[in-house]
Curated annotation (Swiss-Prot):
SUPFAM superfamilies, alphabetized: CarD-like, P-loop containing nucleoside triphosphate hydrolases, TRCF domain-like
Alphabetical keyword list: ATP-binding, Cytoplasm, DNA damage, DNA repair, DNA-binding, Helicase, Hydrolase, Nucleotide-binding
The keyword Nucleotide-binding belongs to this UniProt entry's keyword annotation: yes
Name listed for the protein in its UniProt record: Transcription-repair-coupling factor
CDD domains: DEXHc_TRCF
Residues of the Helicase C-terminal domain: 809-970
Species whose genome carries this gene: Staphylococcus haemolyticus (strain JCSC1435)
Annotated GO MF terms: ATP binding; damaged DNA binding; DNA helicase activity; hydrolase activity
Residues reported in the UniProt entry to bind ATP: 647-654
EC number from the UniProt entry: 3.6.4.-
Family from the record: In the N-terminal section; belongs to the UvrB family. In the C-terminal section; belongs to the helicase family. RecG subfamily.
Amino acid sequence: MRPIISDYIQNDKRFQELDDVFGHQNILVTGLSPSAKATIIAEKYLKDQKQMLLITNNLYQADKLETDILQYIDHSEVYKYPVQDIMTEEFSTQSPQLMSERVRTLTALAHNKKGLFIVPLNGLKKWLTPFELWKDHQITLRVGEDIDVDEFLNKLVNMGYRRESVVSHIGEFSLRGGIIDIYPLIGQPVRIELFDTEVDSIRDFDVETQRSNDNIEEVSITTASDYVITDDVIQHLQSELKTAYEATRPKIDKSVRNDLKETYESFKLFETTFFDHQLLRRLVAFMYEQPSTLIDYFAKDAIIVADEYNRIKETEKTLTTEVDDFIQNLIESGNGFIGQSFMQYDGFESLLKDYPVTYFTLFTSTMPVQLQHIIKFSCKPVQQFYGQYDIMRSEFQRYVHNDYHIVVLVETETKVERIQSMLNEMHIPTVTNVQNDIKSGQVVVTEGSLSEGFELPYMQLVVITERELFKTKQKKQRKRTKTLSNAEKIKSYQDLNVGDYVVHVHHGVGRYLGVETLEVGDVHRDYIKLQYKGTDQLFVPVDQMDQVQKYVASEDKSPKLNKLGGSEWKKTKAKVQQSVEDIADELIALYKEREMSVGYQYGEDTAEQSAFEMDFPYELTPDQAKSIDEIKGDMERERPMDRLLCGDVGYGKTEVAVRAAFKAVMEGKQVAFLVPTTILAQQHYETLIERMQDFPVQIELISRFRSTKEVKETKEGLKSGYVDIVVGTHKLLGKDIHYKDLGLLIVDEEQRFGVRHKERIKTMKTNVDVLTLTATPIPRTLHMSMLGVRDLSVIETPPENRFPVQTYVLEQNSNFIKEALERELSRDGQVFYLYNRVQSIYEKREQLQMLMPDANIAVAHGQMTERDLEETMLSFINGEFDILVTTTIIETGVDVPNANTLIIEEADRFGLSQLYQLRGRVGRSSRIGYAYFLHSANKVLTETAEERLQAIKEFTELGSGFKIAMRDLNIRGAGNLLGKQQHGFIDSVGFDLYSQMLEEAVNEKRGIKEEEPDAPEVEMELNLDAYLPAEYIQNEQAKIEIYKKLRKVETEEQLFDIKDELIDRFNDYPVEVERLLEMVEIKIHALHAGVTLIKDKGKQIEVSLSTKATEQMNGEELFKQTQPLGRAMKLGVKENRMHVTLTKSKQWLDNLKFLVRCLEGSMVIEDEN
């Protein structure tokens, strides 16, 4: 797209006139619409290739301009400095997404990189680390250079990194021997290997496997925070803070002086080795002798652009008042100090006094600066066609007749062809793939996207987007950010920490106390230490660790510890065994019944199906595409489909269901879409109408929102076959509903229907295809255990244009609430205000009404009648209310794309999984969503609430709070899938053992036998110190992980891989580890040779083989191969089993390795044919 418009604009006289003064003098440019303005600014940047600063009044405008600018400039040259419009969010937990964008911007400026930098006003006014100090903390390491290790590690702490034993999250580093691991805020995790003080190698590594990948010659390490805090900064801070405390104390009410003292003491405790960057940022005004602002980071010849000056001044005024009120509030409550602020108060103009500024405004207005030029553009909006082909034809003909240069932007290559053929049918001449030189009177259809089209009459240029043609929304171009798959995120809830509950398959629930090295009979070995009821303790050898699993159950469930040797655990297991067998019977009966029943077999996709799917304006995620293929595969088989489609809220399940519905309708079948609430019915109905508007599909709705007459007509239409798709609540299950030819039943959230309705659904399943949708995740282990008896499709990846919800945790504060509400309403959005006390919910509404007199505020709670509740919700969805004060009834199933702020009072009283689901209510559109979790000021929190809040603080994409929420939701998902009564059984033995028992029961009932190993496990008793010493691997989780891997080794290649991993992660290994690896090597060959026992008997080693291995041994070959051992080896057969005795000598271990290889090499392998 760029060269086409670009070359045309750069050759235009008006642009050249602007270009001569742009960036050299104070000028005013008027008349341009937002996307035309973005185009002109981008062209100027591309021509000059200098640093350009573009200032907007708020983050929302910055995001909008950025989206358009990214159509012209590569995202590697576009930077944004996102600061929330509510500056007081500086006092809450920061979002890593915004932080990494800020750090990326500051880092680029520190390296004097060219780029277009988009900054909202409050980003420009924010106090920052002095430029030289920031620049001094830009680290680039090269292979071969010397470093001072202590100084380097100290610098990492200054830059906001936390030291851990194993690096698993952004902003962490670790030191193990001569290996430093770092996970920077931007870029891949890196492993730096030192030879003394020289950088020997640099490799990137995978935090999941902890293995390194490619060698790199050099690496730049960005800061992990947008502030640099050194020892000197801390000293200066403590001195300034003391002065501020002494100045504040006499000026506040005596009743809050103790609070002030506590606040002061809590900050005074900080020392450089342990401080929280997130917390210290509140004191930025006291940190530096001379703090900088962003303008100090720019080059002297940077071009400065201000967008909509009057809006910027208005925002500045509001900002100053809000920050003053907020700080004053803090001071008066004993939580803040005089002089505490996070922005400078000089006017916006004085910050830019050293630069000429180009001001863009839509209309001419008076400016406070001396302007050298005013350049007026004439720019018109484009006619909104919205699919009205007659108007479209006449307007395009007008452009062609007037010799305009016409550019039509569409978002995908396939759409280029469709729109070209549509215009050709209207006899409008079109071309595609033109690189430059648009001819007048010609329509160029090309790939690209802007927020809106524009017409520049004097240039005779018009740019038209899909938005004007068909009312579609612009797809956001997202910069690539680091995300982990849900599977990766959930994986680490399995990490064992000291104090965690565990389940031993034979002994029951205990508590994990760590890994201990014990000396038994002069030999050192590692054991897993478990605590049981009373003082009972169990030491499990690490080679039996597969009998120990982490105990996972519902949130906040503390299990009872079992007694060692008691019968209680056996009884518990027997009860669960009976339960899983019953479930397995039920599943298999259902499966057999379904396999035997015959339904309608659909044909392959039709041309209409392809056209319908191409009409979808977004790119499918890989999971969506896979699910669609699985569903179509089921429909094209003879047996009826019964598939569960599981995916998080907003991950695109509906589109998958809609495609299945369309496929059914194209073959003359009817579709029933069953949903649990009237609101959802309405929303799905509207989605279907919008999606299928260009196709001959008759869609109807049966719900309380329809009149009796309409419902009657719909029922008749279903009976006659006139209606293709019907959406409705449980009314669809009524006996008075008759279908002419029902082919597909789609059920949304089946677990929310009553028992009677579920029974009715079950009877309908026998001969029609059924697709069930659920937003509660189904655990992967459970998914695996049900393979072959239940068809599951899982959507784990979010759509591309979904932004992570920005999550903040902070104390209750009415000023802050007012700002958050105002900010959302100012962008024409809506707010969910969660207040979970029905008895005082109307009082809360009155309080909010006083804060926001102009807002329309509604209340929704579970004690309202169903009709009132639904009408309130529908009014909110339709935008009649700005704020909805509600209880947790919004937790599931309401889709309000325009509501993108969620405020939850007393968040510490909710469970994590509940908070996770509530948070899913916002950020459903391409706008950024905000979730504020508030807790009462000065409230003493219980320990669990405190842990929960801590987890919520990490509740961003990569945080552990997510993992806990996912764990809890997984268990809820298991209950939904298998029946609520299973919850108790899952809690009694732990989730993993339950899944394992279910899998075994299902396989046994289906007649699938687990493969018997050819040879039993090798028992090894060698008097060797063979273990992983604590000095070599300090982190116990890492140690357990390595033991687990060694236990699974079956080939020498796998063993070599582990040796590489040990050297890669922990450096060269000591003799004890060498011995451990040798024992594993012996075990590999012994297993293949059918050896059952290797025992150290003091002066000799005894090796025993199984009966089967003895039969398969070629004695002649064995004698030949073992000749080098001579008389050190003796061989005999007793009770049909071969026994080999090896006399111990200095090199006995090498001899033993040689012997087991010979035994393996002398086996006669039976011909499998």
